[in-house]
Amino acid sequence: MEFVMKQALGGATKDMGKMLGGDEEKDPDAAKKEEERQEALRQAEEERKAKYAKMEAEREAMRQGIRDKYGIKKKEEREAEAQAAMEANSEGSLTRPKKAIPPGCGDEVEEEDESILDTVIKYLPGPLQDMLKK
């Protein structure tokens, strides 16, 4: 019966006294070991950060090489140039800067007007067509 109880409880009977507030085993070197462990963790973290910084520097050097090769600008540089252009446009203005009109937005309306005018001219008599084309 005792064997079954030990197996069921496992090693919990040893820890029961500690959980109930009993005396804990005091290791004289426990503080020293903990300090060594903390120092080892700190060193490992510093090594990891140094390795990461080195890898990131290598990646950035490779990215910059690709940017130089293909003439690509960094996102921050493009945003800074766009911001400078917006500020230059709005220096004398009292209102907020207008958004840039995408190419082709205003051109389509003029082309449609011309095509409508051309279709109207086609239906006019010859002398009126000559007079309007001039």
UniProtKB/Swiss-Prot annotation:
Q: Name one GO molecular function term.
A: syntaxin binding
Highest taxon, organism lineage = Eukaryota
- Looking at the UniProt entry, the stretches that span the membrane are none
Region: Interaction with the SNARE complex; residue ranges are: 48-70
GO biological process terms on file: regulation of neurotransmitter secretion; synaptic vesicle exocytosis
Q: Which Pfam families does its entry note?
A: Synaphin
Give me the ranges of the annotated region Disordered.
Answer: 1-113
Composition bias, Basic and acidic residues: 15-81
Output the SUPFAM superfamilies linked to this UniProt entry: SNARE fusion complex
Q: Which residues form a coiled coil?
A: 29-69
Main subcellular location: cytoplasm
Query: Where is this protein found?
Result: Cytoplasm, Cytosol; Perikaryon; Presynapse
Q: Could you name the Gene Ontology cellular component terms for this entry?
A: cytosol; perikaryon; SNARE complex; terminal bouton
Q: What keywords are assigned to this protein?
A: Cell projection, Coiled coil, Cytoplasm, Exocytosis, Neurotransmitter transport, Synapse, Transport
Subunit info?
Binds to the SNARE core complex containing SNAP25, VAMP2 and STX1A.
Family, per entry:
Belongs to the complexin/synaphin family.
What this protein is reported to do is described as: Positively regulates a late step in synaptic vesicle exocytosis. Organizes the SNAREs into a cross-linked zigzag topology that, when interposed between the vesicle and plasma membranes, is incompatible with fusion, thereby preventing SNAREs from releasing neurotransmitters until an action potential arrives at the synapse. Also involved in glucose-induced secretion of insulin by pancreatic beta-cells.
**PANTHER family in UniProt:** COMPLEXIN (PTHR16705), COMPLEXIN-1 (PTHR16705:SF6)
Q: What is this protein called?
A: Complexin-1
Q: Which organism is it from?
A: Macaca fascicularis (Crab-eating macaque)
